[in-house]
Design a protein with these regions (language model features):
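A residue-level marker of the well-folded mature domains of exported/periplasmic proteins
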Residues: 21-380
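Bacterial N-terminal signal peptides that target proteins for export
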Residues: 1-8
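Bacterial N-terminal signal peptides
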Residues: 9-17
């Protein structure tokens, strides 16, 4: 049976957030007559690989572009980060509305971003006036698509992330062959959910959450599953997205005779992931799938695990580590798909702002770059 652990940090001074014990955000503001103006959370050079030039443009090094910039008919205003805090995400959206009254589209690249954007638009009375493009299958986002408040969302297949992670790790732990591409990238397709297919998609999600998801196809039918293997699936946070991945792990357990410990760090910190890995190693773990929070600073941690067991990265990659391969979405192509939704919503062009949790995370960089290069009409 799958074991699910939520890693909770001790909070001081009575501060708490929406999940676990993350400190509650204090939205900064500046005085503007009698109006309190929300201030956006912008990347700093040390925090998110961004640096502000003398011209005022911000160079997002992980993304590869200085913003704001013109992209054909579109003007990409910037990328707002929120440190995985939904309250800060809403503050960012509010600040963007005030700073850019003529903004035409807001693109949220992590699951909680579209609901935060919608909340800001609701407060401002601008639902329907500004287009919203999302990412992932947050229930509020799906409902908003049904209600005509969101253009669409790009969805991954976390259910398959869980199932295939267990399949491959169980085989590798037993020294059985897994076909790994030369580039060490095993992609699981993404799709676009719009008003045309949202009801069908929601019905499938409900089936998965009820434990009635379809059994995915395995790569092989001749796996030796004689001995039970002990695996760990570590996420980067607590989110409905990861509940779907957990359901995939549960579906895979009896198929591949595996015991899977699904760990969801409540605060989404590197320290929590490190603690979980060390505990898993000490308890005789045999295979690890992880979504790295800060890949550049987690190489040693991942290598420590890879020295004693097979390790793969899922959802977000750490390509400089000794992980065997990456399993998940092509985040760049998914970003381009989000850019295509922007084009459909704004065929005449307009101003676009991108919102995401942390630009230190590789999937955030790749999705952002995909959106930008699609709006630029850069060849794929």
């Amino acid at each position: 049976m799958t074991h699910i652990r939520f890693i909770v940090a001790v909070c001081l001074l009575g501060l708490f957030g929406l999940t676990g014990c993350e400190p509650a955000p204090v939205a900064p503001s500046s005085s503007n007559g009698n109006k309190e103006v929300p201030q956006a959370t912008t990347p700093t050079p040390g925090d998110a690989g961004a640096a502000t030039s003398e011209s005022g443009a911000t160079m997002y090094e992980g993304v590869g572009y200085a913003l704001p910039m013109k992209a054909g008919k579109y003007e990409i205003l910037g990328i707002r980060t929120d440190n995985k805090d939904s309250s800060a995400a809403k503050t960012n959206a509010q600040a963007s509305l005030l700073a850019h009254p003529d903004i035409a589209c807001m693109v949220g690249l992590w699951a909680y971003n579209p609901p935060a954007i919608l909340s800001a638009l609701e407060d401002a009375g601008k639902i329907g006036q500004i287009k919203v493009v999302g990412f992932d299958e947050h229930p509020e986002t799906l409902q908003a698509i049904s209600d005509g408040k969101v253009v669409g969302t790009i969805v991954q297949q976390p259910y398959l992330f869980g199932f295939k992670s267990v399949e491959y790790l169980a085989a590798l732990a037993r020294k059985q062959e897994v076909k790994i591409p030369e580039d060490k990238m095993l992609y699981i397709p993404h799709t676009s959910v719009t008003a045309d297919n949202v009801l069908e998609f929601k019905a499938n999600i409900e089936k998965i959450n009820a434990g009635e998801g379809d059994l995915p196809a395995s790569d092989r039918t001749d796996y030796d599953i004689t001995n039970t293997v002990k695996l760990s699936f570590i996420t980067n946070s607590i989110d409905p997205f990861w509940v779907l991945a957990q359901k995939g792990c549960e579906k895979a357990e009896p198929v591949f005779n595996a015991k899977v410990d699904v760990i969801m760090p409540s605060n989404g910190t590197v320290e929590q992931q490190k603690q979980s890995i060390e505990t898993f190693i000490n308890n005789g773990g045999q295979g690890l799938a992880i979504s790295p929070i800060n890949p550049a600073n987690q190489v040693d941690m991942i290598n420590q695990a890879a020295a004693v067991m097979p390790v793969l990265c899922q959802d977000s990659d750490a390509p400089e580590s000794n992980r065997l391969f990456y399993l998940g979405t092509s985040n760049y192509q998914a970003g381009r798909a989000a850019g295509k939704l922007v084009k459909q919503a704004l065929p005449e062009g307009g101003k676009v702002m991108i919102f995401v949790g942390k630009l230190e995370v590789l999937n955030a960089q790749e999705r952002s770059r995909g959106v930008i290069e699609e709006l630029m009409d850069k060849p794929e």
